[in-house]
Amino acid sequence: MPTIQQLIRKPRQPKVKRSKSMHLEQCPQKRGVCTRVYTTTPKKPNSAMRKVAKVRLTNGFEVISYIPGESHNLQEHSVVLIRGGRVKDLPGVRYHILRGVLDTQGVKDRKQRRSKYGAKRPK
């Protein structure tokens, strides 16, 4: 434990809070270009083929982001908008691609939670 004199000389430093989605640089979303679209498998208790894309952002960072919903139209050079939010069972995936924005189509025949998947209201 430091003495009062030591604290006067060198005060305590506040802990730096690190962002969980630092490549967004405090923005709610960022635009980027897909450099690779592929599937990967989740961690131990789960089993699936999760769709992910490697995206080069406008600020130069390259991040791995998750493509939510059933089926997608993304391929290399597609322009996408990403938001923060990790996928718990995919290590290294800390971002989500927004559906129904820019080159990404919304999910077809989606009835519930449509706004999250860029689906229009069914007639």
Curated annotation (Swiss-Prot):
Organism annotation: Ruegeria sp. (strain TM1040)
Matches recorded under InterPro entries: NA-bd_OB-fold, Ribosomal_uS12, Ribosomal_uS12_bac
Biological role: With S4 and S5 plays an important role in translational accuracy.
MF (Gene Ontology): rRNA binding; structural constituent of ribosome; tRNA binding
PTM-bearing positions, type 3-methylthioaspartic acid: D89
GO biological process: translation
Top-level taxon of origin: Bacteria
GO CC term, one of those recorded: small ribosomal subunit
Lineage of origin: Bacteria, Pseudomonadati, Pseudomonadota, Alphaproteobacteria, Rhodobacterales
Assembly and binders: Part of the 30S ribosomal subunit. Contacts proteins S8 and S17. May interact with IF1 in the 30S initiation complex.
Name used for this protein in its record: Small ribosomal subunit protein uS12
Keyword terms: Methylation, Ribonucleoprotein, Ribosomal protein, RNA-binding, rRNA-binding, tRNA-binding
Region (Disordered), start-end ranges: 1-28
A Pfam family of this chain: Ribosom_S12_S23
Basic residues compositional bias, start-end: 9-21
Family assignment from sequence similarity: Belongs to the universal ribosomal protein uS12 family.
